[in-house]
C-alpha cells in the first residue's frame, strides 16, 4: 500500500512538473517577441501595420493596387463591403485553410478588414507571423471607413487617379 501511494505521488509530481514546463509554446513566443519588438511609442500603429481610413483612400486615389481581404462572416458581407477590384471575402474561421491562404497575394499590399478592426487585427497579426509581410489592417474597420467617406459614398467604388 505504501509503495502504491509513493508511486502515485511520484507520478502526480511528474505530471505537474511536465504541465508547468509545457505551459506555452516557447518557439512561438520568441517569434512574437521579435514581431512585436518595434511596437513602441507613437510609431506603434505603423509597426503593427495599421492604416487609417484616410490613408487607405489616398492610396487608392493615387492608383496603388490594394487587395482588400474581408474577414467578416458571410452574413455580414451583405450589409456593406469593400468595392475594390481584387477584394477577397474569406471569413476568419476559414482564412487559415491552405486553399484560402493560397488566394492571398504576396506581391501586392493586402488590407485586412472587418466591421470594427478587431478580427482584422487578429487575422493580420497571424498572417504576418506566418510570413505575409505585405499585410496591413484598416484601423477601425469598415465602420471607420464608412464614417470617413459618408453614408452616400461609403459603398461606392473609390475614384482612382486618372
Predicted regions and their residues:
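Short, surface-exposed ligand- or partner-binding patches at beta-edge/loop junctions that are enriched
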Residues: 112-114
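Bacterial N-terminal signal peptides
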Residues: 9-17
